[in-house]
Amino acid sequence: MEDLGENTMVLSTLRSLNNFISQRVEGGSGLDISTSAPGSLQMQYQQSMQLEERAEQIRSKSHLIQVEREKMQMELSHKRARVELERAASTSARNYEREVDRNQELLTRIRQLQEREAGAEEKMQEQLERNRQCQQNLDAASKRLREKEDSLAQAGETINALKGRISELQWSVMDQEMRVKRLESEKQELQEQLDLQHKKCQEANQKIQELQASQEARADHEQQIKDLEQKLSLQEQDAAIVKNMKSELVRLPRLERELKQLREESAHLREMRETNGLLQEELEGLQRKLGRQEKMQETLVGLELENERLLAKLQSWERLDQTMGLSIRTPEDLSRFVVELQQRELALKDKNSAVTSSARGLEKARQQLQEELRQVSGQLLEERKKRETHEALARRLQKRVLLLTKERDGMRAILGSYDSELTPAEYSPQLTRRMREAEDMVQKVHSHSAEMEAQLSQALEELGGQKQRADMLEMELKMLKSQSSSAEQSFLFSREEADTLRLKVEELEGERSRLEEEKRMLEAQLERRALQGDYDQSRTKVLHMSLNPTSVARQRLREDHSQLQAECERLRGLLRAMERGGTVPADLEAAAASLPSSKEVAELKKQVESAELKNQRLKEVFQTKIQEFRKACYTLTGYQIDITTENQYRLTSLYAEHPGDCLIFKATSPSGSKMQLLETEFSHTVGELIEVHLRRQDSIPAFLSSLTLELFSRQTVA
């Protein structure tokens, strides 16, 4: 809105300017040129120039306003484009995440489908193997049935032979009515038994058909394990029926006994042939009875017709046998077939029990392996946590080393200030002695640092090996997880790998304990080195000055040391020469003459003793100053501060009611900038102050000051 107002003002000023110029032009044209003075022309020219300048300014302002408008529009368009781009980017990112999630879901589904396909293939292979076994069993059963058919054919031949014998007996027994009647009665009984046997065969055929139907149903439902139990129940019912059949087949021995009796009678009839001569005498009497025998022959013809009918039934039975595919012609064959079915059923039950037992064992092994995997993963997590704690401890130790180096530098500065107060005459022997001690300490520190660096390198190598082993363990865990997933599908995971993993875990635990001990030793050595003035070369940089007094002093000490070594060698040579009793070389005599006298040695000893006394005084002064500083802090703050353990400080108030009333603070940060109040018996009595000043305000000085005021008020009230 402000831009529109400015634009309208610019347009109005432009219009007024144009009107003014047109009026001036018209007025100027009406005037006479001769009457106008040159001064008025100059004024008009100046005014016209000013008006043109104003017009230019107004035009430039309008142009600037238009440019600013275009700029604002461009910025708005850029903002809109950015917003649209950000929206498009967010939508594309969301779509990408959705696509990634969908891909992951599809991958998981594909894996599940692959696993299901593998399981289905395994089940199909198992079913094919079972079908092959069933086919083999059926082939064996068909072979047995063929053998039984052969045995039935032999039995038919024997029956035909018996028929021939019966015909012979009829011709021989024509003259014996009583015997023929008995034979006829026996034949009738045999026919009845045959009828019973035919009925039993029909029932057996029906049962065989039922068994075939059950076999077909079982072959159709073998793919499903659950339906096997139902089939087993059906087979048990069939077994009960077969048992009933067995009870009926027990009657077969009685028929065999009757056959034996018939054979004995045939033998007896053979003997009767011998007595045929005697029977011929009775032939006349038997001719009278011929009419009766003719009637008997008619009955025999009827019996033969019935026999033919029975033979037709036998042939139809054999045809049914061939059409059904089961070679069962006798009850014995049926009993054998039933026994085979029972044996197959028992074998299937044994296989089922073996499969279930193996599945249970594999399931138990899988569960044990899963537990072992969980234990190994837990141990790995513990190892990682311990490694993190060790790294944190190493960082704390490094920070502590830095603090100790700072304290050492402060102590050196204090000692330097005390040394600066000494006179130059007293300073030089003390400096030389201190430089010697410093050089010895430097050599010791260098040697110790070399040892520590070697130990640190070994520890780092061992840590690297430990990390590699941890990585190997992680890879083995991943392999174990993949193997456990495959074991859940196929149950083929072995316990040997679990035992090896246990051994590896035990070895790693031993190595971890050993590394922890080495780490503790290294931490102790680092503390000692820090107390001795060592520093971390990777983090602390030492600057060496070109004209360093310490380097000059060291150079002098080295020169003095070399001179002293040369003098010692000369003195040793002198002693050897004197012991041998030979002449002393001139250079050794000169060296002996140049040695310091006993007075100089006594003076040097006095200087050393005075330096030691000065150091002792400095230590005493330092201790007294520290005591004074602590007393001043105690009187000023009202709290006595004592260091109990590492990073723990005990504060005892000046106005404490009991000597055991104290507060314990623990430094949570290495620099000591953050403190944490530990729980004590006295802290339970000041819970309100802790809640107000520490938890809400987070101010330890306010808490301590309020605590001193409260204790002071208690003492004054008391």
Curated annotation (Swiss-Prot):
Phosphotyrosine modification, residue list: Y634
Annotated positions of the Phosphoserine modification: S16, S214, S428, S598, S610
Induction text: Increased by p53/TP53.
Necessary for interaction with NEK2, as annotated region: 380-532
Post-translational modification as stated in the protein's UniProt record: Phosphorylated; by BUB1. Become hyperphosphorylated in late S through M phases or after mitotic spindle damage. Phosphorylated; by TTK.
Keyword Acetylation set for record: yes
Phenotype when changing R558H: In a cancer cell line
InterPro entries per UniProt: Mad1
Pfam families the record matches: MAD (PF05557)
One BP annotation, GO: attachment of mitotic spindle microtubules to kinetochore
Stretches of the chain forming a coiled coil according to its record: 46-632
GO cellular component: centrosome; cytoplasm; cytosol; kinetochore; MAD1 complex; mitotic spindle; mitotic spindle assembly checkpoint MAD1-MAD2 complex; nuclear envelope
Cross-link (Glycyl lysine isopeptide (Lys-Gly) (interchain with G-Cter in SUMO2)) at residue(s): K61
Annotated phenotype, changing R572H: In a cancer cell line
Similarity comment: family membership: Belongs to the MAD1 family.
PANTHER family assigned: MITOTIC SPINDLE ASSEMBLY CHECKPOINT PROTEIN MAD1, MITOTIC SPINDLE ASSEMBLY CHECKPOINT PROTEIN MAD1 MITOTIC ARREST DEFICIENT-LIKE PROTEIN 1
Subunit-structure text: Homodimer. Dimerizes via its N- and C- terminal regions. Heterodimerizes with MAD2L1 in order to form a tetrameric MAD1L1-MAD2L1 core complex. Interacts with the closed conformation form of MAD2L1 (C-MAD2) and open conformation form of MAD2L1 (O-MAD2). It is unclear whether MAD1L1 dimerization promotes the conversion of closed to open conformation of MAD2L1. Formation of a heterotetrameric core complex containing two molecules each of MAD1L1 and of MAD2L1 promotes binding of another molecule of MAD2L1 to each MAD2L1, resulting in a heterohexamer.
Illness: Mosaic variegated aneuploidy syndrome 7 with inflammation and tumor predisposition: A form of mosaic variegated aneuploidy syndrome, a severe disorder characterized by mosaic aneuploidies, predominantly trisomies and monosomies, involving multiple different chromosomes and tissues. Affected individuals typically present with severe intrauterine growth retardation and microcephaly. Eye anomalies, mild dysmorphism, variable developmental delay, and a broad spectrum of additional congenital abnormalities and medical conditions may also occur.
Protein name: Mitotic spindle assembly checkpoint protein MAD1
Gene designation: MAD1L1
